[in-house]
Amino acid sequence: MEQYSILGRIGEGAHGIVFKAKHIETGETVALKKVALRKLEEGIPNQALREIKALQEIEDNQHVVKLKDFFPHGTGFVLVFDFMLSDLSEVIRNYQRPLTPAQVKCYMMMLLKGVAFLHHNNIMHRDLKPANLLISPSGHLKVADFGLARLFSNQGERLYSHQVATRWYRAPELLYGARKYDEGVDLWAVGCIFGELLNSSPLFPGENDIEQLCCVLRVLGTPTQDSWPEIVELPDYNKITFKENPAIPLEEIVPDTSSQAIDLLYKFLVYPSKQRCSARQVGNRKWSPGPEVMFSRVRVQ
């Protein structure tokens, strides 16, 4: 720790405090995440271990935050990351400078590239949300916070916790208690983030799990066995019933948006997980959320 000079406190998460620091020898500005162990006998928290393991599993990628180092410190340890100026939630909430269609597209392209890279490496993030998408001083978006990340298998036999993902971005199968799921939970979250970029507010702002499900059903309509055959296999399917509700066109939920962007939103926000368009597929498509803008000409300030 003595090789770093603390410049200030950035924030605090469930398992640690994040500081802005400078490496004394190189002058590089970094972010230090200090994780304290409440009891030595309990060892390193599972979420911290998952974050380290996930970031060690993947190679450097310009759209995934880099774990530069980690080392023991006192009764805990420190993770060293690239320093990032802000996060996407701060960008969205900046009402003085609303996002332009070109900026929405730029951020989405970077998000899709990061998620495609993770899924190619068999990693489910399981907590994608604007606050976990960090923005570098140069404007690059990077996926961060891998405390809930898990390696996944295409065999589909492994059981996972359904208590993952921040509620507003939680896929409907998780809200119905699914223990067997795939990277589609990340793709649903990508759709929610996309809608929030377009609308400057969350698409499904539920205050509890039941209300969250109601928010989704109110927009996408009540699912049936025809529209979502797997729903009858979900653990909580028979625990609560909803009256039949027709879908509301997304054009009404996200007004003043191009037909291409609406079409893309529909490809993420679909009930059956297997029908959600992969990040790699979308990254290869040509689309525009508004005026025709070439991605190569977009520079995020």
PLM regions: where:
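Catalytic-loop of the protein kinase fold
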Residues: 119-136
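Conserved N-lobe ATP-binding subsite of Hanks-type protein kinase domains
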Residues: 17
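C-terminal lobe substrate-recognition/regulatory segment of protein kinase catalytic domains
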Residues: 222-267
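Activation segment signature within eukaryotic-like protein kinase domains
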Residues: 107-108
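Conserved activation segment of eukaryotic-like protein kinases, specifically the C-terminal portion
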Residues: 160-174
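Conserved N-lobe beta3->alphaC-helix segment of eukaryotic protein kinase catalytic domains
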Residues: 29, 34-60
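Short beta-strand micro-motifs within the conserved protein kinase catalytic domain, predominantly
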Residues: 66-75, 85
